[in-house]
Amino acid sequence: MILDKIIAQTKKDLDNRKNSNDFNKFLAQKRDFRDVKKALKATPDNPYRIIAEVKKASPSKGIIKEDFNPVEIAKEYIEVADAMSILTEPHFFQGSLEYLKEINKFSPIPLLRKDFIIDEFQIAEAYAAGADFILLIAKALDVSTLKRLYDFAKNTGLEVLFEIHDEEDLQKGLEVGADIIGFNHRNLETFEMDMDLSKKLIPKLPKNVIVVAESGINDFETVKKLSRNGVDAYLVGEHFMRQDNIKKAVLTLKGKTE
């Protein structure tokens, strides 16, 4: 399973980084946070919130954007998106924590460190690099580890996007107390899509949870359909990366024109 391979590589990388970096040094930095929940919660005047992703490649699709300039992409996103996701996993997604650090220098919108978080050290890195929220993947860890990392992130001031793929994951999210839950329509084992996942599981969530839809969102019709199911925000990467006019593509998914 691809997730197992990514986690194994992440552990290997972590061991190297932990030997040469001081965990507490990252957290000693004083910083402000951009308001993640305000950015992601749908409102009547902005019902379709977009988390636009800076993404060069993926295990299922290979290289998605050849002429990849993360800073230039981010400068377009900040004009039209509500938040931004930056892939920092280097081996399978060709991401980098350096992209996050650079984009943090100028972004007025909240930033997600999109990675395979399995250790407090990565959360400290995200904090120091300027992230406002991190991703925790329910499938990747047992519930006690998820709870420990969730609480650690919250205590540093970071928000958490808790990603689920099925009902078992949802139960983990409820146990952890997750207040921003992402429904990944793509099965991490088979890469197959289930666009009805959120429709099936949203009724089981507490009312105060912010709901994010991930994967397979390529047109405004899909956004409207998911919105009727109770989705607040839409995390979109590959679709935007394949467009010549990124700003126009974001606005189209928000149901707007330039």
From Swiss-Prot:
PANTHER family: INDOLE-3-GLYCEROL-PHOSPHATE SYNTHASE, TRYPTOPHAN BIOSYNTHESIS PROTEIN. It is an enzyme of class 4 (lyase). Pfam families: IGPS. This is Indole-3-glycerol phosphate synthase. Pathway: Amino-acid biosynthesis; L-tryptophan biosynthesis; L-tryptophan from chorismate: step 4/5. Belongs to the TrpC family. NCBIfam families: PRK00278.2-4, PRK00278.2-5. One of its GO terms (molecular function) is indole-3-glycerol-phosphate synthase activity. The gene is trpC. It catalyses: 1-(2-carboxyphenylamino)-1-deoxy-D-ribulose 5-phosphate + H(+) = (1S,2R)-1-C-(indol-3-yl)glycerol 3-phosphate + CO2 + H2O. GO terms for biological process: L-tryptophan biosynthetic process. It comes from the Bacteria. Keywords: Amino-acid biosynthesis, Aromatic amino acid biosynthesis, Decarboxylase, Lyase, Tryptophan biosynthesis. Its EC number is 4.1.1.48.
